[in-house]
Amino acid sequence: TGLPIYNKFVDKLEAYMAAHGKSGLFFVSSDFSNFQYVNEMYGYEVGDRILHDFAIALQEKCQNGVLFCRVTSDHFVGVLKEDTVEKARDKYLEFTNTFVQKTNSRYDQCNLVIATGMYEILENDWSVSSMMDNANEARKQCKTQKVDSAVEIYTEKFRKNLENTREIVSGMVAAYNNKEFRAYLQPKVSLHTGKVVGAEALVR
């Protein structure tokens, strides 16, 4: 695609932050909602062409002092530099909307939608993977609530939800290691005969 691989992107971002600081930096995570539909409707060759075109569009943005890379097939991450999070959101949304409109006019059954999560990088942030986790969390929320291309900004609410999820997962691992889980079989009874016809397995 011409974009750097993720590891190279991380190296460049860490070097940039060390040299220039983190003020005005916003981490973005974008993917295409229901992209499998595009592949099924037009074929993988067209799908790959759309992703390649998006990568080229991102490369052009990279000339303005921002960084981007392709993480997986239709998942791209990068860093923007703007005065405020509102400006970063509005400019990036304008960019994705322009790309979507151009692509949808070319492939009229495409109905392309780009979901983006955005996280404002703070002075005490150094872990790029954590920045991406935060942007991903906002992106997932964007995909569940929006039917058009949109940019969801990571907030304190997302942080609390992410911490709660991590605590639950950590607690589940500890409970499994301590053999605290118990398996139960909940009977399924036929409404016609009143007899047990099966069971549902539950773990608590």
Set out the residue ranges of the language-model regions:
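Conserved long alpha-helical elements within nucleotide-processing catalytic cores of c-di-GMP signaling
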Residues: T1-F26, S33-E60, C69-S73, V77-G78, ...
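Active-site core of bacterial EAL-family cyclic-dinucleotide phosphodiesterase domains
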Residues: K8, K12, K157, N164-R204
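Structural alpha-helical segments in enzyme catalytic/regulatory domains
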Residues: A15-A18, T96, K102-T103, E167-A174
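Short beta-strand edge/capping elements of PAS-family sensory modules
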Residues: G24, S149, V197-E200
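Sensory input modules used in signal transduction
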Residues: S29, T116-M118, L185, V203
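A short pre-motif secondary-structure segment
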Residues: V66-V71, C110
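Catalytic strand-loop-helix junctions within cyclic-nucleotide turnover domains
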Residues: V79-A88, R106-Q109, V113-M131, T155-N161, ...
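Catalytic/regulatory signature loops of cyclic-dinucleotide turnover enzymes
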Residues: M131-T155, G171-R182
